[in-house]
From Swiss-Prot:
Annotated source species: Xylella fastidiosa (strain M12)
Subcellular location: Cytoplasm
Protein task: Catalyzes the transfer of a phosphate group to glutamate to form L-glutamate 5-phosphate.
GO molecular function: ATP binding; glutamate 5-kinase activity; RNA binding
PUA domain mapped to chain residues: 288-370
SMART domains referenced in this protein's UniProt entry, alphabetically: PUA
GO BP term (any one): L-proline biosynthetic process
Entry superkingdom: Bacteria
Listed name of the protein: Glutamate 5-kinase
Coiled-coil annotated residue ranges, if any: none
Record PROSITE patterns: GLUTAMATE_5_KINASE, PUA
EC number, as in UniProt: 2.7.2.11
Length: 384
């Protein structure tokens, strides 16, 4: 078997500006020697994270390694193909080790976020996960996300953390997804077996041919190989997010990332973030019912791109729940209720009726709880 070609085969290219990103780190980097977690490669990645946070950007880490860490604590246990219960036990043992590894690199709090398939399939839990991640970023913490292998069952698993990283990137409206691998980027074939493999430093449009190039190889100790990384790039690209594949074992490559230089593969999105988001908002099913707003609120939404606040609400129709897609209407000379916009509502119909016309600061007093100042946030709203 031949060695991996050096990173210099990939020309250096600039990384466009971004303000929010996800970094995915796999087991092959955190447990490279098969003997549990090691800071060997994680330290360089931590420097990349710190440099960007210091510059005012926001980052979420999606990190594998819990099962590998657990396996090192109680050897020998079945490999990754073993019983589900054994794997879940290993994840429970190793997750604390994984968070401790990341915390040692940072002088800011590291937040553990464990997600399951149901958290992302159920709209309300999806919104709660998004709100939690956004708040953690707002507080200046570093969220470290992993799939909750301790409770996930095979038929409801997200499958791999490449896929999870793409979902999280869309969840937080990221502009970039960085996937650290144990290979330099995408090649025309596996460079570990074919010395004539050619590097692909930029992919404008991912095709079935690219997936075929990646094959079905998987990295040692994990569940995802290059094919799953390309599938994640497809998912991220559908949300307007750039994906960057790079060698996380190369200090030079990782240091270059901190200076917005990539030696690896850039995979372009299939649409812009705005187009992807607005398309989903415009075409998702709408629940029965609507919120009627006054002329001032209508002007703020239509002309200023504002969020919908309770002060501009006149009434709520129907029995919608928090997280539902609802219609926002206003009065016109010809119609008592004219469709203006649609969006994801932060409060139920019953709650909206109670806080209609009030100031946002009074929500807590009127309801006894609050989900924020807005009824429909501008990021969750599209004009018709």
């Amino acid at each position: 078997m031949t060695g991996i070609p050096p990173p210099s085969r990939f020309p250096e290219q600039p990384i466009p500006p971004w303000r929010r990103a996800v970094l995915k780190v796999g087991s092959s980097l955190l447990a490279a020697d098969g003997g549990g977690l090691s800071p060997r490669f994680a330290l360089d990645l931590a420097h990349f994270v710190s440099a960007n946070i210091t510059a005012g950007r926001q980052l979420v880490i999606v990190s594998s390694g819990a099962v590998a860490a657990g396996r090192a604590l109680i050897p020998p246990l079945p490999e990754s193909g073993g019983a589900l219960a054994a794997r879940q036990a290993l994840a429970a043992l190793g997750q604390a080790q994984l968070i401790a590894l990341w915390q040692r690199f940072f002088d800011r709090p590291v937040a553990q976020v464990l997600l399951t398939h149901d958290d992302l399939r159920n709209r309300r839990r999806y919104l709660n996960a998004r709100a939690t991640l956004r708040e953690l970023l707002h507080l200046g913490t570093l969220p470290v996300v992993n799939e909750n292998d301790t409770v996930s069952v095979d038929e409801l698993k997200l499958g791999d953390n490449d896929n999870l990283a793409a979902i999280v990137a869309a969840l937080i409206d990221a502009q970039a997804l960085f996937i650290a691998t144990d290979i330099d980027g995408l090649y025309t074939t596996d460079p570990r077996h074919h010395p004539d493999a050619q590097p692909l430093h930029e992919v404008r449009t991912l095709t079935p041919e690219h997936l075929a190039m990646a094959g079905d190889s998987s990295s040692t100790g994990g569940t995802g190989g290059m094919r799953t990384k390309l599938e994640a790039a497809l998912k991220a690209g559908a949300a307007g997010i750039d994906t960057y594949l790079f060698n996380g074992r190369s200090s030079d490559v990782v240091r270059g990332l901190a200076q917005h230089r990539l030696r690896g593969t850039r995979i372009h999105p299939t649409c812009t973030p705005i187009a992807a988001r607005k398309y989903w908002l415009r075409h998702a099913p709408v629940e029965p019912g609507a919120i009627l707003i006054d002329a001032g609120a209508a002007a703020a939404l239509a002309q200023q791109g504002a969020s919908l606040l309770p002060g501009g609400v006149l009434s709520a129709e129907g029995d919608f729940r928090r997280g539902d897609m609802i219609q926002i209407t206003t009065r016109s000379p010809d119609h008592p209720s004219h469709p203006l916009a649609r969006g994801l509502v932060q409060y139920s119909a019953a709650d909206v009726r109670r806080i209609a016309g009030c100031h946002s600061r009074d929500i807590q007093t009127l309801l006894g709880y609050t989900y924020g100042d807005t009824i429909v946030h501008r990021d969750d709203l599209v004009l018709l």
